[in-house]
Amino acid sequence: MSILSYTFFQNALLGSLLASILCGLIGTYIVARRLVFISGGITQASVGGIGIGVYLGFSPILSAAAFSVLSACGIQWFSHRRDMREDSAIAIFWTLGMSIGIICSFLAPGFTPELSSYLFGNILTVTPSDLYLLGTLALIAIVVFTCFLRPLVSMAFDAEFARSQRLPVITVEYLMMDFIALTIVACLRMVGIVLVISLLTIPQVTANIFTHSFKRMALLSIVTGYSGCLGGLYLSYHYNIPSGASIIFVSILIYLVCKGISWSIPRWKRQ
């Protein structure tokens, strides 16, 4: 029987596509705004939400989403204060989330196997509820980036110019930080906390080899991201190795191949 006939593998393929679309769009904004470190801080802070969910006995995804959104808003708020640097704010929420997660998982009654699944992920365990979450966020991202692409690009590359055009920069920054937090949480089941930031950066860095256009970079990120997911699934199935690590490994291989190809392409053709 073909592996494609199994429901869990069909869910993995659909989840990969939805995650590639979502991460392709949001990740392009992250890379353009140079928010990779902040996104990494939010990712690690989500451990606190997962630990709270495990300890209280309800969905770790919901608690991680709430905790990550609050952490994102907290980092954004502290980053705009003159008495605290951005990297210091990230470190505070990063370590706060990790400490809360460790304490809650230690105090949780019984064995907590769910915690390790969120740390390392397994795309083959993606559930229909995970697909609904990914699909909803991907649809919202498509609508937002289609309708508000020019303002988002303006704010991503030159926030001061955007302010001079009377664009609501602060409001949009908070909303995008919350969107980043939800995107991270939605992808935890696929690759886990340890590797989720890679889905939001490696395809974008690969796309950036060939173009500096925000729109083309987002589209190429979706293609390279999905290619990495498919290749990772293939390796995971045939060699019985963790799917999350396989996806990231293949994504990095794609980056290296594209980097090699770019050396033979004149710079003016990549603009």
Annotate each predicted stretch with a short phrase.
Residues 130-203:
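Helix-loop-helix "hairpin" substructures at the membrane interface of multi-pass membrane proteins
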Residues 6-11, 82, 90-150, 178:
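Transmembrane helix-bundle core of multi-pass membrane transporters
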Residues 241-248, 252-271:
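Cytosolic-side transmembrane-helix boundaries in multi-pass membrane proteins
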Residues 15-24, 45, 49, 53, ...:
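Alpha-helical transmembrane segments in multi-pass membrane proteins
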Residues 13-18, 61-66, 91-92, 131-136, ...:
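Hydrophobic alpha-helical transmembrane segments
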Residues 28-111, 207-219, 236-239, 263-264:
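Short loop segments and helix-boundary regions at transmembrane helix junctions
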Residues 190, 194-245:
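Transmembrane alpha-helical segments in multi-pass inner-membrane proteins
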Residues 1-21, 270:
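Membrane-interfacial amphipathic/re-entrant helices at transmembrane-helix boundaries
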